[in-house]
Amino acid sequence: LGVTMLWICPMYKSPLADNGYDISDYYDMLEDYGTMEDVDALIAEAKKRNIGILMDLVINHTSDEHAWFQEALKDPNSKYRNYYIFKKGVDGHAPTNWRSVFGGSVWEKVGNEETYYFHAFAKKQPDLNWENPEMRKDIYKMINWWLDKGISGFRVDAINFIKKDQRWCD
C-alpha cells in the first residue's frame, strides 16, 4: 500500500467527554486502546516497516479530571492554579462576555469562590495557561517523553487557541 505514516487520534487516558480530546493523563493510555506496552510494540513494529507514528496532541486544554486541574481546584495556592486560567468575577458575573466554541460562556464558576476558570471548548476542558513558563516546561517534558519513546511527531489540535488576549476585554 505504500503506507509511510500512521496518524493516531487521541488515545491518551480520558473520561471521553469529547472523544478523547479531554486528556486526563498524557502518560497513560485509554484502556480501550490497550496498554503502554501495546504502544511500545506498535512503535517497534511500525519502525521495522519504515512506518512512522503521528499522534494527535491536545495542549490547549486538559480534562477537568487531569491531576493538575484537580489540584488547582482543591488548593487556590497550589502552583497548578496558575497552570490554568482563573479570574475573579466582576460584580457577580463572569470576567468577560466571551463565548465558547461549543456555546455558552467560556467561564465556569469555581464552587464557593468568586473565581471562574476559562474553557474555550466544553466546561470539562479547562484551558492551560500558556503564559506560565512552568506549565510550558511540563508540556515540553511530556512531548519529549513521547518522542523518546519513538513516535515520529504530532498533529497538534486547537493550536490556534493557546494564545489568549491578555486584556480580557468584552
Features from the language model and the residues they span:
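Acidic/aromatic-lined carbohydrate-recognition and catalytic surfaces
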Residues: 1-140, 144, 148, 159-170
